[in-house]
Amino acid sequence: MRSAIEEKIVTARIALLLKKPFFGNMATRLKLIEKPEIGTAATDGRHLWYAPEFIERLNPKQTEFLLAHEVLHVAFEH
């Protein structure tokens, strides 16, 4: 069963798939891992680590932006 935070991230992924398919497709490939100690979010290209308290403060558009931002790290390999 998904947490409310995971649902928020999944909803943002779906929105990206509909609005920006490239970003949405890449975002769906990242495995979600809760990691409060990182403070925000990060990726290594296979995982998306996130701090639940940070995600909780974001509105839906900000959550979509965060996912697109993390996906760009993957796309640009940095």
Sequence positions of predicted segments:
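Basic/hydrophobic alpha-helical interface regions
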Residues: 1-67, 71-78
